[in-house]
């Protein structure tokens, strides 16, 4: 399903005393069924400071653009969608948003065609490879692998920060209200275990099934030789060399901070590094998705590109189980196979300190 287009906005407030914009800026979106003006009206309700837009940018896949901006400027975040910007950084953020929106606009037709390809059974043929296809595949694989690495390091940082805060709270050096992290136990909602029901009572299960056909796509798979070519080297991508060097040093430094015997002393550095890691992870995720669309577009209706990648879409028969009807006719049996999954813990890190409220 196509991601919605819309407007990415930069909003700020007028200081009632100076009549100038404050340093706090909200970066958010409205999808194509709404307008920034209506969003401002909603924010204005009960707010004594006048809210105005600093910049509004039209963009396809606008949610993707918003996530990118929030990640890249994580260090300036003061809570939620609010950021503290000096004039220079604000200009940088707006110009960056305009550039990335242009990238998304340039891909709009490609994305639309790829979404149509995804609904169509692929042929048995493979497209002949060329240097452009190999370059797309190398870049996609490089970004995909390093984005996963960044995400893993961020997870380790989150756990370490939470451990340090737990220790500080235990020593009365930090109150629970001041902590930036939150450990949550996630309790999955009860769900009907269709597979268990099918394996135990197949005949009854089939009474509530219909067979339908649909096109199912497999994950885009990169050829082993291309993976070996790309590896973790940026030799194919000189424009990313400096950035990749920064990331490599940042990961090494962050790992040393995590392993530090005095974690409290490096707490602030961990927070700073987390923001930098998040910036690069957001960039890599954004680029990876765009290169994936380009590579799939190069596949077209074929099942892949010879020696480069495969992207198969097959017409399959699918059992469609009518759970609603089954529950109505067999409520006790439905309850018997409705179970709650095992709970698990997740660590969340707040996005900056909350913006001061001025009345």
What is each of the regions a protein language model found here?
Residues 277-283:
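Extended, low-complexity amphipathic alpha-helical repeat segments
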